[in-house]
C-alpha cells in the first residue's frame, strides 16, 4: 500500500524531490521535498485508490467511527469520498472560526459524544490536524484518530501528535517515497544521502552539502 501510493504521488507530480535544488517552505526552512496532494483531485484513478486506502485504514484502526471530518481545505474532498464509501456523515473543520454568519469552525454536524476520525492530506508538523482535533474535542466529540495520505515522518510532528494524545496513520510516508524514487531511477545514491540526512534533522541545513 505505502509504495503503491508513493508511486502514484510521484507519477502525477503531487510530490517533488529536489535534494540538489531545495524548496523553501513558508516557515523559511529549506527542504528537499514538496508535497501538493491537491493534484490528486485531478486524477480519478489516483483519488479512488486514496479513498479506498483511507477507508481501509479507518476500518482497521477505527472500526467504531461514526463521523468523518475533513481538514479545511485539502482534506475536505478526500473526507467526502471516504464518507460516501462508508455511508457515514461528514463534516469539515476550519483552521479558525468564521468571522461572519454563525461563526462556525465546524461545518456540518459533529455532535457531542460522536466518534470522529479526521482525514488530512499531509502530516508535516501536525499543527493543522491538531487544530482540527481540538475543535472537535471542544464540541464534545470523541476523536478516535487521524488518517492521512502522506507523512514526512518528522520527529516534531510525531511529538506534537503524542502530546495532543492523538494517534495517526498514513497511507504512505517519506521512507516509502524515497525508496520508490530510487527504484525508479529518479534519485541516485548522493541524492538519497541528502534526503536521509534532512529527515534526521530538518532544521540543520548541513544536509544540503552532505
Curated annotation (Swiss-Prot):
Catalytic activity: orotidine 5'-phosphate + diphosphate = orotate + 5-phospho-alpha-D-ribose 1-diphosphate
Residues the record lists as binding orotate: 124
Gene Ontology molecular function, alphabetical: magnesium ion binding; orotate phosphoribosyltransferase activity
Superkingdom assignment: Bacteria
Cofactor(s) this protein cannot do without: Mg(2+)
A Pfam family the protein falls into: Pribosyltran
This protein's UniProt keywords: Glycosyltransferase, Magnesium, Pyrimidine biosynthesis, Transferase
Enzyme class: transferase
Residues engaged in binding 5-phospho-alpha-D-ribose 1-diphosphate: 94, 98, 100, 120-128
EC numbers on record: 2.4.2.10
CDD domains referenced in this protein's UniProt entry, alphabetically: PRTases_typeI
Gene Ontology biological process terms in this record: 'de novo' UMP biosynthetic process; pyrimidine nucleobase biosynthetic process
Pathway the protein takes part in: Pyrimidine metabolism; UMP biosynthesis via de novo pathway; UMP from orotate: step 1/2
Record text on subunit structure and interactions: Homodimer.
HAMAP family hit by this protein: PyrE (MF_01208)
Protein family (similarity comment): Belongs to the purine/pyrimidine phosphoribosyltransferase family. PyrE subfamily.
Stated role: Catalyzes the transfer of a ribosyl phosphate group from 5-phosphoribose 1-diphosphate to orotate, leading to the formation of orotidine monophosphate (OMP).
Protein name (database record): Orotate phosphoribosyltransferase
Amino acid at each position: 500500500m505505502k509504495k503503491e501510493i508513493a508511486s502514484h504521488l510521484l507519477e502525477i507530480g503531487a510530490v517533488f524531490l529536489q535534494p540538489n535544488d531545495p524548496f523553501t517552505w513558508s516557515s523559511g526552512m529549506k527542504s528537499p521535498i514538496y508535497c501538493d496532494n491537491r493534484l490528486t483531485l485531478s486524477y480519478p484513478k489516483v483519488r479512488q485508490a486514496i479513498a479506498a486506502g483511507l477507508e481501509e485504514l479507518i476500518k482497521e484502526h477505527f472500526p467504531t467511527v461514526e463521523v468523518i471530518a475533513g481538514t479545511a481545505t485539502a482534506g475536505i474532498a478526500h473526507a467526502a469520498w471516504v464518507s460516501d464509501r462508508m455511508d457515514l456523515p461528514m463534516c469539515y473543520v476550519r483552521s479558525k472560526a468564521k468571522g461572519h454568519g454563525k461563526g462556525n469552525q465546524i461545518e456540518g454536524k459533529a455532535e457531542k459524544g460522536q466518534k470522529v476520525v479526521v482525514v488530512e492530506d499531509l502530516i508535516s508538523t501536525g499543527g493543522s490536524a491538531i487544530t482540527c482535533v481540538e475543535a472537535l474535542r471542544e464540541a464534545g466529540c470523541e476523536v478516535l484518530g487521524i488518517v492521512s495520505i502522506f507523512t514526512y515522518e518528522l520527529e516534531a510532528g510525531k511529538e506534537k501528535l503524542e502530546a495532543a494524545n492523538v494517534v495517526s496513520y498514513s497511507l504512505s510516508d517519506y521512507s516509502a517515497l524515497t525508496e520508490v524514487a530510487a527504484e525508479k531511477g529518479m534519485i541516485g545514491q548522493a541524492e538519497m544521502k541528502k534526503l536521509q540526512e534532512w529527515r534526521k534533522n530538518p532544521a540543520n541545513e548541513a544536509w544540503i552539502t552532505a
